[in-house]
Amino acid sequence: SSLKIKDCEIDVGELAVKCPFFDEIKNDSPNLSDFINEELISVINKDSDRPKNPSHIVLYGFGRIGRLVARMMTQSTGPGNYFRLKGIVIRKASDDDIYKRASLLTRDSVHGTFDGTVRVDEENSTLVINGNPVKMIYASSPADVDYSDYGILDPIVIDNTGVWREEKDLSAHIKSGASKVILTAPAKGDIKNIVYGINDQILNENDQIISAASCTTNAIVPVLKSINDEYSIKGGHIETVHSYTNDQNLIDNFHKGDRRGRGAPLNMVITTTGAVKAVAKALPELEGKLTGNAIRVPT
């Protein structure tokens, strides 16, 4: 059967299970054609829902979060009709920087080997990830970049450095050509901290800079909202058990923090967390009702 269908995903296995005469059909069976036409009526002879031009995405930073987002965007790349990773902005650490970045993307101690191909095009300062050319842009700050120089048009910039958290600083991405900025850390000031499924309804098309909050905030806010909606929270304490981070020492040594000098792989380290403030931004009704701290643990 030859059908004109729009871009979509079709589960052939599900169709086979639903077909009441699957074991008896032959190729080009009229009954089969009728069955398929009936099941796929919503996508036959319809225009595609996909936009004509994909939104360009730029990762500003290529640490843990940046590399995992790059994996997610390119591992099952498809035609890239909605979003397309076009650039990664980092500070150059060495002459062979691009090869080391490629290695870190390919191999991850927690998430394993990248399910795809990563090729270095050193001459063009490009990583070709699953066939997607991604420009490696070396810059010290957002002000040093003009995305149009690289053929990147009105990109959505995902700032995963955590260095800039205020609107006046993150606005530098807009001046560099970004259409929107998503911060992967709790924001300061009036920037909206969004926990998807909880308060994303406050977003509007005019928002240029938003925060996706933090891992802790995304983990605890849905639970707190459920409890507060059902029973009403009068007060509480957030104790987050967190993987140790790059800010800690591998072995006991001096650290500006009170406890972070202890060897990370061998100790549970109590420290502060910004999750309480971030929770209050997502759930304003809990402001002033919570305290919190974090325990960095070996993982």
Model-derived regions, located:
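N-terminal Rossmann-like NAD(P) cofactor-binding subdomain of oxidoreductases
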Residues: S1-N249
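C-terminal substrate-binding/catalytic lobe of Rossmann-fold NAD(P)-dependent dehydrogenases
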Residues: E230-G235, E239-S243, D247-T299
